[in-house]
């Protein structure tokens, strides 16, 4: 799979860390446990809306914005 074909969720899972040293790693850990997370999506608006309306595990949407920037840098 080329990096550009990778969904956001697939990329995010590369950041899982049981010792979660930062907020993106904690986000990845929590998204892994979220069975409703839109796993195939690479659409910023769809993901943002899902996170704003359906989750309580993000302390701030800034964490998603940071993760999205890192994701795009690798695409």
UniProtKB/Swiss-Prot annotation:
Top-level taxon: Bacteria
InterPro entries found in the cross-reference section: UPF0346, YozE_SAM-like, YozE_SAM-like_sf
Gene3D superfamilies: YozE SAM-like (1.10.150.260)
A Pfam family the protein falls into: YozE_SAM_like
Family affiliation: Belongs to the UPF0346 family.
Protein name, per record: UPF0346 protein LEUM_0763
Natural source organism: Leuconostoc mesenteroides subsp. mesenteroides (strain ATCC 8293 / DSM 20343 / BCRC 11652 / CCM 1803 / JCM 6124 / NCDO 523 / NBRC 100496 / NCIMB 8023 / NCTC 12954 / NRRL B-1118 / 37Y)
């Amino acid at each position: 799979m080329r990096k550009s074909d990778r969904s956001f969720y697939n990329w995010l899972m590369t950041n899982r860390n049981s010792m979660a040293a930062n907020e993106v790693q904690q986000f990845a850990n929590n998204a892994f446990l979220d069975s409703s997370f839109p796993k195939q999506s690479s659409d910023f608006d769809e993901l943002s809306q899902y996170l704003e309306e359906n989750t309580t595990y993000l302390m701030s949407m800034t964490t998603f914005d940071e993760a999205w920037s890192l994701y795009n840098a690798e695409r």
